[in-house]
Amino acid sequence: MRLNIPTKPEDALWTDDQWKAIQANGNNILVAAAAGSGKTAVLVTRIIEKLINETENLNVDELLIVTFTNVSAAEMKYRIGKSLEEALVQNPESVHLKKQVALLNYASISTLHSFCLEIIRKHYFEADIDPNFRLIEPIESSMIRDEVLEDLLEKEYSIENNEGFFHLVESFTGDRSDAELHTLISKLYDFSRANPNPDLWLEQMVSFYDTQAITSITELPYFPIIKEDIQLRINQAKSYLLTAIDYANENNGPAPYLSTLENDLAQINTLSSISWDNWQDVKFGFESIDFKRIPALKNKADFDEEYVEEAKKFRDAAKKEVKNVLIDWFSREEENYLSDLEKMKPDIKTLSELVKKFAENFFEEKQQRGVLDFNDLEHLALKILLKNGAPSDVANSYKKQFKEVLIDEYQDTNMVQETILLLVTNSNDTKGNLFMVGDVKQSIYRFRLAEPTLFMAKYQEYQQDGEGSGIRIDLSQNFRSRKEVLDATNFIFHQLMDKHIAEIDYDEAAELTLGASFPEANNMATELLLIDMKSEEKESEDELSPQELQKNQVESRAIATKIREMIDNKFPIYDKKLQQNRPIQYRDIVILARAMTSAPDMEEAMKIKDIPFYANNNSGYFETTEVATMIALMKVIDNPYQDISLAAVLRSPIIGLNEEELGQIRMAKKKGYFFDAMLAYKDITVSDAANKISRFITQLNNWRELSIRENLTALIWQIYQETNFYEFVGGLPGGKQRQANLRALYDRANQYEKTSFRGLFRFVRFVERLEVRGDDLGTAKTLGEKEDVVRMMTIHASKGLEFPVVIVSGLSRKFNMRDIYSKTLLDKDYGFASNYRDIEKMIVYPTIMQQAIKQKKYREMIAEEMRVLYVALTRAEEKLILTATVPDFEKTSKNWLQVSNQQETILPAAIRAKAKCYLDWIGNATIRHSHFKELLCEEKIKTLPTDMKLQVEIKTKEMFLTDDLEKEKSDNWMENVKAHKQVPVKSPYKDEIERFMHYQYKDEEATGIRAKQSVTELKRQFSLQDSWSDTSILKEFQKVSLDRPKFLQQNKLSATEIGTAMHTLMQAVPLDDKPTEKDLVSLLQLMREKDILTEAQIKAINVNQIIAFFESALGKTVLQKKDKVKREVPFSYLLPAAKLYNQTNLDEHVLIQGVVDSMIEEEDSIILIDYKTDKIEGRYDNWEAAEKVMKERYQIQIKLYAEAIQAISRKKVSHAYLYFFDGQHICQINIEEGI
């Protein structure tokens, strides 16, 4: 269609694209507005132009304007109102304008949640809900959710023959609790609610496990993900080998390697032409890769050692890529991968039904309480707007009402919100009325289930000329930042973003162009500050060796140093209001971070440099001493029989007891609750501590009565008044903040009591749940937004904001991969994926679906993190500083040099996709800048043409320890150390510290006793001596026996590993008849197919030794009494430590754990049999000599077995035998003597 755009006035300040966005009509419009492009101004102007144009006869209440936040909605309404009033001043007689001012308060300018709430309140009867509902906060909703879910699971447990549910519990939970299932149901519920039809989404989730009609992995719906991942790894292996070949071709490079490397590359290239129609062909292709041994270099001195090592390193990396493909995608047979999914289908169906039941019960419970939560708003609005799959009468009325629907931040919309918006617009007509503004490069809310693909689909579908289903307008001109900031952003993201990795191309339409005007300046180059954490090899003899500071601490000090330099040097900042430069102020600087974990270190570093600092941190509230003390006191008031909370209160300033007095309380009553011990101490002791306790008990009783009579806030205020705790914390360091935290506790208790929950017990439980979930509330704010301080905030919190100087910190912080590597994965397209747990064998396998979804989620995470970085870099107006630590700059820069010969602007996909942190991207991008090339003196680097001004600084961590060293020198600290003199102590706690240091623990012997010990470990320890009394055993208890690493297990199996294999086979041999060699070989083959034993283990097993056992008298007895035989019997047995150590003063116990190989359980007695794989033949002269050694070695183990089994079964162990496979010897152990 032809765009009828009015001619732009000559004096208009708008760009052509902005003018087009303001004036375009006649179809759906998507405005792709880059960072700083003035999208909000364009959106407001478009609305105002429509309203003041009386020929359009458009009223403000005929527009639906949807914003992302309530703040944005309020600002939008303010701007529109102000513009209307200004227009009315110009045309005071306009009835139309007066009408718009009057209607403004009734206009639909809000978040989508608010619009949904408006729909529900007007049409509640269509949703069949009580019109007097109350909208609850997420915290109250989560509490109701927990109660409903606990009730649901309890009911499921109580249903008889509920086999499907119990199998699900066994498959997806641990041994100790069903907390994992609780979390899983809750997550699935949340995820399903991001879909217009949650029940349908859950049913589709089950369908992905139906593989009966599927004959090959290539037919799976997510096979393209698998294929793409494998191809990416093939390309990465190629890249590694090409880099290795480059090193081999260097002067003095390892040229003898070339033939092998080129052969490797040829093999990898064959994989590019592999047929993807047959999974077995793909598998065969990778299994056929044979990396030959690299030739030895005869005259090593002729070759550059660095080139040799780098060539080897990159070849090894290529080999690892191929190996990982085999591990990740071909570790199991194709039919096993498919059958695993089919076996899981019943569990997934049960899980799906559970989530549906929970959703129904949860909504019913909220209805009974007369409340709704934010999730309900969208789905109830959808229920009202959609009837039988078509727009309802209500939806059609909104379509008639709204002449245009305008959406801000469209890139953060999800599927439910999209469906709602489409139901109230004419978007499906030939003349749509949907106006969407956003920037998909700034879509950073996928964790809130935002769906950026909605934006991208329209971006690709809509045309700039208006033909087709919509109009696309690109706003790329940036009116926020200096050219230096824009050049840096473009230089980096031209190399990073494309549709393949970032889900969008960073092309000419997407790049930022200069729109703002700043005076020329020479010091605005983008800075990359890297701190090398590698310690200097030699320290100055007259200085203390620097302490090993954590990365966050060093980087924080480097940033503080940089800020102090800028402040001291009066770094110039352009003031847009004054239209001239002025010296930089603290408020001009913001530090951005992906997370706030480094905030405490940053605060400490700023204190050192005397820089006022404020961190917008939403965590740490419950950890503050004053709040933790109050929470502990409330727990004690609710239930005084809570030892830890009671001890915390007694030790706190509220009561003021010390550790020694707490110890005396416990001695007053050694066993039982600490509260009872406190009462006993009060009654038998006359002391200051007893007086404090008496007063506390009186107060406690009063508070307990008050908690019943009054509300929670009255109780908290009474505690503040009676104890003077509020005044006390005000006198401590940071007293203003501490008092603000206590006031916040009072306020939050007040908010809590406005919910549907009441009482102290529920509040305490509510706080405990917040702590367990990590839903901290953040310390109270004591600083205003306008104060002159350096601010630190997350990148997410900075979205939509701008600052003169931006320091993007923590670029080497690893991406959060926790969700990707969790046991269960959720995906909008494929539902739910997890491991397959074989309950009978107790073996867990990764499923092909889990592997595929993991790769999909990883790629989505990489794309999201790339967009987060884009948001961070585009916050800067004038100066951009990037900071990171590197473990060893020399090695790190060599890794970046892998792209030095890259011809294309875009970096290789594999390098971008495998990034572990932002620095992996920034390092590989900036190393192709001429400044970096000069810094490294690397002529082979192929630089990219750019206007970007870059300044790279490499600092050592020792540079930021000066403050500590100067302080130490001022205290004559080093001089005293060198003179072997006592270091002066200025602490007021000197005496108390010395008392701590000289404290002697009276039960020191008990510290050497483990609470739990295996019989095997005890046997090994006791083989060192003949009695239990030797105290050298204590040291043995501290030793840890570790399994051999995987790379060592590839060699010959150890004796222990062979023994494990023999025991595993003995556990599986059928006892119906004496096994033959054929029987055992078949059994071993089956165990290999089911991954119970490895090929190496099977080869180590001598089946003739197994046959010989069943031919022995002991073996025949086992076969004869097969119905009474139990194998691999685990047990736990509590044994007095005094018995083990022969020390009567030990009042401790040791939990002994072990597994009996085999036992024959008669009616009144038991025979124990333990199999041994010790080497006998050829090691001892005769069996008598061997028997003596074996009895000494194993008698403790067998006696412990016997004592434990007798105590547990209450049957006498009549006989105990050791059977040695080597030589077929039977050894009877005398158990009558006991231990």
From Swiss-Prot:
Catalytic activity: Couples ATP hydrolysis with the unwinding of duplex DNA by translocating in the 3'-5' direction; ATP + H2O = ADP + phosphate + H(+)
Domain of life: Bacteria
Start and end residues of each UvrD-like helicase ATP-binding domain: 12-482
MF terms in GO: 3'-5' DNA helicase activity; 3'-5' exonuclease activity; ATP binding; ATP hydrolysis activity; double-stranded DNA binding
GO BP terms in the entry: double-strand break repair via homologous recombination
Gene3D superfamilies, alphabetized: 3.90.320.10, P-loop containing nucleotide triphosphate hydrolases
UniProt entry keywords in alphabetical sequence: ATP-binding, DNA damage, DNA repair, DNA-binding, Exonuclease, Helicase, Hydrolase, Isomerase, Nuclease, Nucleotide-binding
Classification via PROSITE patterns: UVRD_HELICASE_ATP_BIND, UVRD_HELICASE_CTER
Domain UvrD-like helicase C-terminal: from-to ranges: 509-800
Cofactor names: Mg(2+)
InterPro entries to which the protein is assigned, alphabetical: AddA, DNA_helicase_UvrD-like_C, DNA_helicase_UvrD/REP, P-loop_NTPase, PDDEXK-like_dom_sf, PDDEXK_AddAB-type, Restrct_endonuc-II-like, UvrD-like_ATP-bd
Residues involved in ATP binding: 33-40
EC number: 3.1.-.-, 5.6.2.4
Gene Ontology CC annotation, any one: DNA helicase complex
Function (record text): The heterodimer acts as both an ATP-dependent DNA helicase and an ATP-dependent, dual-direction single-stranded exonuclease. Recognizes the chi site generating a DNA molecule suitable for the initiation of homologous recombination. The AddA nuclease domain is required for chi fragment generation; this subunit has the helicase and 3' -> 5' nuclease activities.
HAMAP family the record matches: AddA (MF_01451)
Binding partners and assembly: Heterodimer of AddA and AddB/RexB.
PANTHER family per record: ATP-DEPENDENT HELICASE_NUCLEASE SUBUNIT A, UVRD / RECB / PCRA DNA HELICASE FAMILY MEMBER
Family of this protein: Belongs to the helicase family. AddA subfamily.
Protein name: ATP-dependent helicase/nuclease subunit A
Organism this protein belongs to: Listeria innocua serovar 6a (strain ATCC BAA-680 / CLIP 11262)
